[in-house]
């Protein structure tokens, strides 16, 4: 076991089993390391060949002995410096032997760590004071954490003021350690050394008060060490800032040097150029001028060649495009001419074929059927039907859902109403003001609200709210908005009250039934009247035959096969035309300024005339022939109507005069010797006219 020097203290390793001094062999510790750590002077070789590191104890790392612990057997062996060896304890020899064994183990471990890492695993802790301390200072006590650090305090430097330092350092208990980018506490081997908190441990003792005297105690655990660590870290932060500034200054210095070098290179290059230009001769300048001229001429020639090539290419391409466009235009013009020619030929062929097949009659019948009141009545019923209205609403809704229609509607700012249409407030006010003169009893609330009569209560309420927002005087600044809102309110009062709504619906149903009956009667009467007007009286069968109005003008009414054209016709002209390769013959007549098809009447009269003649073969006379006169005679317009057909003709604004009743012999005018009892034959009843029929002179056709 190495002997302890009275004025020195060895670095001790802390173990939970007991404390031992740290000693190394002479060959294991490098003198350079000792000089580096500042321990060369404090290193000493023990008599047994062991090299010991001594540490001068100071007042900061010493602790005075406590005699109370010596005399009190309950405290066990003392932890701090004990009494003089002369007093001695019976267990001192045993403790020394144990310490020597532990010292040897620690020395071997330190040697092994130094050989592996290449750096010492211990650092010297120089004393903070110059006092020698007391002889026989024992090894420091072990820390509670077992980190292997221990220290001893000099009893000359320990004072009760340390208790006051404990109170001053309470503010450092909760502070977090400062962090910097670089760790200044690392050693050169890269191995993390023990922190100062672990290096400087103070003995923790209980405060013992004996006979009113306060025993000096060491400061709190880790407090002084933490204070030093905070101070070192602040110092390290300052050093780090200084180091960063030094690095920045060094980088700026190198940049400045590089800039100066670059400027020098440019200056050197310029000098070389100037020197080279100074050595040039006049002939060199002439050669340079010639060389520049040659290259300029070459570049000019190349440019002219490129320009000529590009211009020729452009003109060739343009000419080719023009020729292609001309050819395409010629083909299009030819195709258009062929198409128009085919259309013209097809139209002529269709017209000729239709004339041969009698398509004009069918076309006239089709147009007459389309214009018939029955078809109009059916269309009206279809429009008033509920499925048709639902289909219309569905189509309107689909149209309004289209993206471009929605965008246009949003730009215009229109407001939708319940019926699906979009109107502006001004338009709604104008629409409501058109019904201002309608009495309230005759007001149609559904028309006012813009919904159908079959709308539900929800649809009615929705329509009323939307219209109320648009036409309310507070929302709409129209001068007559209040009047329009009153009309809307009156309509809402009718449909919102169940009794008034039921009464209105009953009234509407009665009006609809009456109007439907009247419309049916009038439509039937109109059909009968039109049928009566489009019939001809037949003197042969005493019946009526239908006539069909043709879509022909009087100026081009008759077809002539000799001239292959249409000739004009006069009032009363009667002619025939053939169709279907001459298999069908149709009879026409010009009556009342219109061309009629009277084939039925002519067939009953058994008239046989040649078709498609140049001249009119027959002429129908609608007037009376005065005895002693010859030629064409027509009744005067002043003659009164003879039958119901004349009366109906006047009702339907047919010009008065002879009617096309199919009778070639009108009633003769009363002579001067005749009495007033004589009547025209047309006014005589059928039963009485039969015996008098023989007295008539028949001249049906006059040329």
Swiss-Prot record:
GO terms for biological process: protein transport. The chain crosses the membrane at residues 305-325, 327-347. The keyword Chaperone applies. Residues 193-202, 219-228, 691-703 have a biased composition (Basic residues). Residues 91-102, 163-176 have a biased composition (Acidic residues). Its main location: endoplasmic reticulum. Residues 121-133, 673-684 have a biased composition (Polar residues). The keyword Protein biosynthesis does not apply. GO terms for molecular function: dopamine receptor binding. GO terms for cellular component: endoplasmic reticulum membrane. It is a multi-pass membrane protein. Residues 444-508 form the J domain. Keywords: Chaperone, Endoplasmic reticulum, Membrane, Protein transport, Transmembrane, Transmembrane helix, Transport. CDD domains: DnaJ (cd06257). Residues 17-28 have a biased composition (Low complexity). Residues 1-11, 203-218 have a biased composition (Basic and acidic residues). Residues 75-84 have a biased composition (Pro residues). It comes from the Eukaryota. InterPro entries: DnaJ_domain, J_dom_sf, Jiv, Viral_replicn-host_int_reg. PANTHER family: DNAJ HOMOLOG SUBFAMILY C MEMBER 14. This is DnaJ homolog subfamily C member 14. It comes from Mus musculus (Mouse). The lineage of its organism: Eukaryota, Metazoa, Chordata, Craniata, Vertebrata.
């Amino acid at each position: 076991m190495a002997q302890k020097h009275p004025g020195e203290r060895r670095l001790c390793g802390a173990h939970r089993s007991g404390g031992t001094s740290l000693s190394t062999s002479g060959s294991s510790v490098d003198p350079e390391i000792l000089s580096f750590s500042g321990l060369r002077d404090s290193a000493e070789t023990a008599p047994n060949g062991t090299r010991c590191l001594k540490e001068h104890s100071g007042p900061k790392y010493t602790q005075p002995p406590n005699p109370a612990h010596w005399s009190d057997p309950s405290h066990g062996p003392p932890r701090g410096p004990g009494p003089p060896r002369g007093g001695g304890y019976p267990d001192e020899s045993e403790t020394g032997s144990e310490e020597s064994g532990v010292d040897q183990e620690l020395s071997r471990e330190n040697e092994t760590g130094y050989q592996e890492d290449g750096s010492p695993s211990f650092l010297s802790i120089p004393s903070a004071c110059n006092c020698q301390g007391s002889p026989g200072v024992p090894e420091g006590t072990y820390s509670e954490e077992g980190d292997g650090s221990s220290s001893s305090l000099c009893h000359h430097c320990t004072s009760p003021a340390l208790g006051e330092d404990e109170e001053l350092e309470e503010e450092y208990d909760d502070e977090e350690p400062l962090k910097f980018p670089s760790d200044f506490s690392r050693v050169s081997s890269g191995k993390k050394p023990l922190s100062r908190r672990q290096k400087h441990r103070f003995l923790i003792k209980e405060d013992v008060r004996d006979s009113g005297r306060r025993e000096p105690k060491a400061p709190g655990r880790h407090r002084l060490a933490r204070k030093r660590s905070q101070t070192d870290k602040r110092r390290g932060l300052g050093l780090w800032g200084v180091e960063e500034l030094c690095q920045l200054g060094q980088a700026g210095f190198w940049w400045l040097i590089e800039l100066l070098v670059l400027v020098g290179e440019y200056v050197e290059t310029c000098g070389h150029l100037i020197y080279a230009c100074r050595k040039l001769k006049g002939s060199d300048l002439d050669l340079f001028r010639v060389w520049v001229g040659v290259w300029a001429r070459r570049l000019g020639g190349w440019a002219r060649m490129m320009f000529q090539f590009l211009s020729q290419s452009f003109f060739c391409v343009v000419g080719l495009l023009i020729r292609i466009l001309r050819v395409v235009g010629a083909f299009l013009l030819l195709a258009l001419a062929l198409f128009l020619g085919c259309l013209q030929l097809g139209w002529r062929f269709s017209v000729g074929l239709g004339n041969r097949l009698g398509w004009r009659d069918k076309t006239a019948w089709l147009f007459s059927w389309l214009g018939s009141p029955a078809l109009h009545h059916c269309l009206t019923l279809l429009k008033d039907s509920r499925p048709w209205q639902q289909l219309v609403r569905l189509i309107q809704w689909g149209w309004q859902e289209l993206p471009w229609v929605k965008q246009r509607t949003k730009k215009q700012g229109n407001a939708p109403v319940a019926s699906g249409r979009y109107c502006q407030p001004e338009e709604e006010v104008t629409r409501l003001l058109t019904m201002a003169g309608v009495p309230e009893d005759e007001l149609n609330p559904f028309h006012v609200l813009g919904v159908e009569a079959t709308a539900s209560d929800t649809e009615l309420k929705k329509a009323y709210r939307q219209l109320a927002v648009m036409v309310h005087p507070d929302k709409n600044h129209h001068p007559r908005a209040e009047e329009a809102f009153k009309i809307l309110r009156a309509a809402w009062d009718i449909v919102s009250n169940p009794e008034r709504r039921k009464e209105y619906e009953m009234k509407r149903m009665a009006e609809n039934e009456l109007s439907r009956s009247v419309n049916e009667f009038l439509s039937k009467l109109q059909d009968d009247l039109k049928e009566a007007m489009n019939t001809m009286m037949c003197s042969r069968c005493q019946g009526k035959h239908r006539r069909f109005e043709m879509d022909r003008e009087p100026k081009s009414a008759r077809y002539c096969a000799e001239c292959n054209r249409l000739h004009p016709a006069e009032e009363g002209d009667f002619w025939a035309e053939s169709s279907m390769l001459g298999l069908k013959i149709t009879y026409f007549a010009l009556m009342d300024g219109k061309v009629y098809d009277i084939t039925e009447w002519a067939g009953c009269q058994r008239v046989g005339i040649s078709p498609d003649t140049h001249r009119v073969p027959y002429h129908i006379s609608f007037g009376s022939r005065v005895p002693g006169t010859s030629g064409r005679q027509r009744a005067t317009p002043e003659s009164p109507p003879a039958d119901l057909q004349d009366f109906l003709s006047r009702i339907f604004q047919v010009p008065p005069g002879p009617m096309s009743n199919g009778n070639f012999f009108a009633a003769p005018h009363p002579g001067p010797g005749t009495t007033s009892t004589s009547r025209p034959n047309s006014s005589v009843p059928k039963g009485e006219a039969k015996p008098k029929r023989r007295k008539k002179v028949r001249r049906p056709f006059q040329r």
